[in-house]
């Protein structure tokens, strides 16, 4: 059972299904318009295993230890309180479960083009050390082999057992 936070139009859920073949995927987004688009794509992409829900990644509407895996395709940096987003991911993830993430850092989204295209909070931002520390503080162990640059991080963190 998997969760994608900030699912947008559903592309991430399609990747999750094709790559990991989970029995079910819950996909959550705060933007109803994006969820409506994801609903249309769900039919076109034959994603019967997908359940769409309106919700906030800073306050996930799920029970503790509900998911085997949580996926984040560049959503945490959109959260005003990104720390609560990480805490919530850890809370809903089962022990031994994986948090699969891709995140970008301020040097990338502070670019004028990014600022024009997408809204990003400007206060309480993170870079690599803060993001990695927050994972550890919430019982999420970053696996070796993660990729990081000045602009982004890509990796998997496993919840401690």
Give, region by region, the residue ranges found by the protein language model.
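Class I SAM-dependent methyltransferase SAM/SAH-binding core
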Residues: 3, 8-59
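A conserved beta-strand element that flanks and buttresses the S-adenosyl-L-methionine
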Residues: 71
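Short catalytic micro-motifs in class I SAM-dependent methyltransferases
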Residues: 74-75
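Short N-terminal helix/helix-N-cap motif within the alpha/beta-hydrolase-1
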Residues: 80-84, 109
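A short glycine-rich, Lys/Arg-flanked "PGG" loop and its adjoining helix->strand segment in the class I
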Residues: 83-95
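C-terminal alpha-helical "lid/dimerization" subdomain adjacent to the S-adenosyl-L-methionine
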Residues: 100-155
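C-terminal lobe and adjacent flexible extensions of AdoMet/dcAdoMet transferase-like proteins
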Residues: 156-161
């Amino acid at each position: 059972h998997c969760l994608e936070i900030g699912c947008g139009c559903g592309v991430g859920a399609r990747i999750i299904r094709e790559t990991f073949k989970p029995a079910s995927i819950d996909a959550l987004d705060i933007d109803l318009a994006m969820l409506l688009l994801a609903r249309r794509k769900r039919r076109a992409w034959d994603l019967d295993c997908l359940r769409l829900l309106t919700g906030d990644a800073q306050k996930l509407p799920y029970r503790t230890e509900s998911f085997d895996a949580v996926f984040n395709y560049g959503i945490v940096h959109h959260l005003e309180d990104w720390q609560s987003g990480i805490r919530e991911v850890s809370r809903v993830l089962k022990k031994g479960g994986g948090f699969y993430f891709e995140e970008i850092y301020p040097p990338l989204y502070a670019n004028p083009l990014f600022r024009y295209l997408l809204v990003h909070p400007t206060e309480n931002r993170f870079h690599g050390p803060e993001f990695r520390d927050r994972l550890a503080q919430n019982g999420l162990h970053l696996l070796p082999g993660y990729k990081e640059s000045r602009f982004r991080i890509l990796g998997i963190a496993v919840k401690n057992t």
